[in-house]
């Protein structure tokens, strides 16, 4: 269901954000990853 996907994305995105800030990954790389 959409709601489950949304929750998974949110749960996945939080640690991703932390990693991104630690590694200083540009947003473009993250966008590529999600597309």
From Swiss-Prot:
Please give one Gene Ontology molecular function term for this protein: pheromone binding
Tissue specificity here reads: Antenna.
Q: Relate the protein's function as given in its record.
A: This major soluble protein in olfactory sensilla of male moths might serve to solubilize the extremely hydrophobic pheromone molecules and to transport pheromone through the aqueous lymph to receptors located on olfactory cilia.
| Protein name, per record | Pheromone-binding protein 1
Subunit structure comment from the entry: Homodimer.
Supply the InterPro entries for this chain: Odorant/phero-bd_Lep (IPR006072), PBP_GOBP_sf (IPR036728)
Position of the signal peptide = none
Protein family according to the UniProt entry: Belongs to the PBP/GOBP family.
Any Gene Ontology biological process:
response to pheromone
Ordered alphabetically, the record's keywords are: Pheromone response, Pheromone-binding, Transport
